[in-house]
């Protein structure tokens, strides 16, 4: 196929030749994208039809998420479904009129063949152009209107916070999440099952706020079952994108940077709350995997590992019964029973390693010592890991995306806060410095690029890139005590409010001002696989408003949430980050300031406790311009100040005194 990148050359050619545009959107770790490439795009006869009748454009959805959002929204409006590969047909002026996902090379699965679709659309474009233009106009109008979904139009900024956000709303969110929860296998909804990290995090925080044991039970069940499942790489660490079954046995084997970052976030909170070493070990092993397989030598993080190797999904990760016997010898029977390895296989005639029962439970069933069993299993896992290492590896998508890197930086900060391992702070700092060095736009003040690869950065950053980066800068200050990160967060927030704000000054567009190659500026408010940029910006504005006493930022954050609150309460699994914001609005934020020569030690001690809703600042001396750190200094003392809602209590010397006050 004569593929073009999305750009001026292809778009002008479509206008000059008056040809429809075929846009195929996929991503490197997408199994069905590879299948369609192999079956259709690499077939000469099919390629001839595509080249003759269409201007063909291929887009990596991770490089251009703005275009993916627009055309996926159009596909869902047309068909009620979505997914990748996303194949969408446009008029020469970029407006969508038809689309679909995977099409087979011959008619099958109740789908027409790809060639049939191409020829029918080419004929329709020539013979029924008016119908096509009408459909394109309708869809484009829908795309503009979809920005309004779920939001109330009038500003609610004048209503007191305690009237807008209530305990009753938090309770309803909890009940709505629980109504979708799988009480046996954890997680939410039916297969395919995604991790649901935002809902798990809400349950942890709801329990911490209101002492709700059932919320904690469901959150921990979800984490435990994923950690025991095939969705988690039992040998090498790291989580796959989702499970194809309700038991978390058979994953779709691609490993994404963002999933692992978000799971490290929530595992860190679970560890702070429970001190369960299974969570600390999973964090340790997952970050070891990230560092070993998904990190550039200069410190940035790669995007994804493919599901396939040698053209077979999961081949790198699965085992035959005979292989395990050969490697482990007399230890094999016990290992195979524990990890469900059988002669006939537990998935497509091969075996995915997973724990049907937790190790301690299995030890009790077998009447053997749990510590001795864990030691034996650890040795077995190491032997199998060494045996697996020379296999042909899944493909690596080595793009370095600003937003996903920011998610992993945030995760490293959370892991450092929870476990105290200095190496995680080093990883976070190096990755942030990588972003600052390689993804900044020197010609655009505070601007950034979206993606970097092989020394080249491209595409202006999108809202979620900037929102996640601000959040990561805030987290980095909280664990390092370096206030420079906070200054950068404030400057980037000012840039975002200038470049991304909508006309009402409430929400933010996904793209910056002046981007000419999109047919509509979308506003993304759902929390999908990654958080909504708007939800994270609301949290950033609320945090920085407290730090810098910026009342207008606090008002905007409140208004963003208030206009959405009814929708958030009804659909919390689609608005999980917003739901967490609502809970924080109800509970309030602890503002903790530490001033004195031992401030870093005291800040470190704060992280030993689970305090999910906090602002934490520290410095050796007073800091003019930061109200929480003004007029706090006392000679030879390190003092800890606790404030909430513009009211502070008497400073204390020791962290235990603060912990008692927080309780």
Predicted region positions:
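Glycine-rich, acidic and aromatic/proline-enriched surface loops and short helix-turn segments
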Residues: 225-232, 430-441
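Conserved helix-loop functional segments at active or binding sites
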Residues: 386, 390, 414-418, 434-441, ...
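Inter-helical turn/loop segments and adjacent helix faces that build the functional surface
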Residues: 206-210, 270-278, 415-422, 476-483, ...
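Catalytic nucleophile-loop/oxyanion-hole region of alpha/beta-hydrolase
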Residues: 279, 424, 457-460
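Long, polar/charge-rich, low-hydrophobicity segments
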Residues: 292-295, 443-467, 474-624
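Replace the tail clause
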Residues: 1-411, 415-418, 517, 561-663
